[in-house]
Each structure stands twice: as C-alpha cells, then as structure tokens.
A protein has these predicted regions:
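NAD(P)-cofactor binding segment of oxidoreductase domains
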Residues: 17-53, 70-81
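Oxidoreductase cofactor-interface core, primarily capturing Rossmann-like NAD(P)-dependent enzymes
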Residues: 7-10, 30, 47, 58-177, ...
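Glycine/threonine-rich flexible loop motifs
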Residues: 31-36, 63, 213-214
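A hydrophobic C-terminal alpha-helical subdomain
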Residues: 184-260
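Hydrophobic/aromatic beta-strand patches that form the interior of the parallel beta-sheet core
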Residues: 2, 23, 53, 91-93, ...
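Conserved Rossmann-fold cofactor-binding substructure of NAD(P)-dependent oxidoreductases
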Residues: 1-21, 31
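Short, amphipathic alpha-helical "lid/cap" segments that border enzyme active or binding sites
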Residues: 13, 19, 132-140, 235-243
C-alpha cells in the first residue's frame, strides 16, 4: 500500500516503480481528471512503465469534439497526452454506458416511483451497455495482455428502449410505462439551454448530455468490438443483469455496488 495524494510526485514514483502496467480508476471533476492523470502518466513515463490504462470506461469519446460533451473532455485530453509520452503506451477501455448507471436516478431513464421508462427520440435508438463487473473483468484481462494497447472496445449488450422494456417484462412480469419526452433534436436543444444558464451546475445538465450521446449514434462502439479477444469472459446482457436484481432494488443497484 502506497499512501499519498494524487499530486504527490514522490508517492506516485514509489507507486509505479517496477510496474509493467498501471490501471487508473480516478473519478472527479474535470481539473482532477486531467491534472491527476497527467501526474500519474508522467510518473509512469519516468519509470518506463510499459502501459497506462486510462480512467475512461465509457462511450467512444474519440468521435466527439472538445466541448461536445464537457464531462468527456478529460478523456480526450488524456488520450492526446498519451500520444506524446516517450515510454508508456496508453490503453483506453470503452464499454458504452454502465448498466447499473442506466438504472440509477443519474441517467433519468428509469423512474421506479412511476414504473416508467422515459426516453428521447423514436425509441429505436440503441443503448450500448456493460456491467461494472464485466468492465472490471475485461480490464483485468487487458492488464495481463501485454499486447493490448490503444483503444479496446467491449460490450455486454445493445438494446433500444422498447427491447429493454420487454426484457423487464420477461424478468419481472411487469410492463413498464414508456414515455417519450421529445425528439433527439428536442433533447439537444434542452440540454444546451440548461448548460448555457450555468455550466458549473453539472448535475443540472449531465444526465441530458449522457442520454444524448449514448443514443445519437455519434459515439457508438459496437462496430469494432474486442470481446472475441477474451472468450472466457461472457458479459451479461440486459436480461442477465436484470436477473441479478429485484425490481425494487433496481434503481439503487449502482449505489449498492459502489458501497460494497
């Protein structure tokens, strides 16, 4: 165990000394995600660590421009930063949206109090998603595979909101209500209006940007997956994941996971 702050250069150097690969799982605001990762990457580069697994675990942000989805700007900046290192090579794991996050209040899709799925668009837009557990398993496999560098794309399932509702009905015997809130263009307009009022109020706009870029097709990962590289990992589908939770605890599955 190496104790120290994320900006403690001496502690970072002790931490990475002698390592072949470093897995970053930082989570914080944009300044932290950029500067703390840069400090860790610099320590890895000085120590000639072979690979650095960036704290990504999301949709394909490489298809976005800076500023499109502000919460993903740090990923783009770190991706570029790793192109300039002398020794350490970057690894970027993309998994779509976490399934547990999809069900949480953070996403604003599943509303347990009204037994409803609220969506934007036609409803035919697919959600690409992977569980936290499967993302961790793929990350461990990547860490053990010295040939794995660059972008690595994995997916548990790909379903639209109607198919997800069918999966819920099949699992729980309950048909959720489906409520369309507007077109994708409506969503884009609303999210930018809210963002423009107060960009610092991240919780006012984050879920809307999250929904938009998860389903508008711009940042999809399913066209070039790496699942087949690790055939021993059988990722859960939406149905599989639903089967591990009862309906009442579904919306808290992310918090329960993170607290355990």
């Amino acid at each position: 165990m190496i104790a120290g702050e994320a900006n403690d250069g001496a502690a970072l150097s002790r931490f990475v000394d002698g390592l072949d690969v470093v897995i970053c799982a930082y989570l914080g605001d944009n300044d932290f995600m950029i500067n703390a990762q840069k400090a860790l990457i610099d320590a890895c580069d000085r120590a000639h660590v072979a690979r650095y697994i960036a704290s990504d675990y999301c949709l394909d942000y490489t298809q976005l421009n800076l500023g499109d989805y502000p919460a993903k700007d740090p990923m783009k900046i770190i991706h570029s930063y790793l192109q300039e290192t002398k020794h350490v090579k970057g690894v970027h794991i993309l998994i779509g949206a976490f399934m547990e996050t999809f069900w949480s209040s953070h996403s604003q899709v599943w509303h347990a109090d009204s037994n409803s799925l609220k969506y934007w668009g036609t409803g035919e837009e697919p959600w690409e998603s992977t569980t936290y557990g499967d993302a961790a398993r793929f990350t461990a496999a990547i860490a053990l595979d010295s040939s794995a560098v660059g972008m690595q794309k994995f997916l548990g399932d790909r379903k639209n909101i109607f198919q997800i509702a069918q999966a819920m009905n099949k699992t729980y015997g309950v048909q959720p209500k489906l409520q369309c809130q507007g077109s994708l263009e409506d969503l884009r307009r609303v999210m930018h209006e809210i963002f423009a009022k107060d960009p610092s109020n991240i919780y006012a706009w984050l879920a809307l940007f999250y929904q938009y870029y998860c389903i508008n097709g711009q940042a999809e990962i399913s066209n070039d997956l790496d699942n087949q590289k690790y055939p021993d990992i059988k990722p859960q589908t939406f149905e599989d994941s639903l089967g591990t939770h009862d309906l009442q605890s579904l919306s808290s599955s992310m918090n329960n996971l993170l607290n355990n």
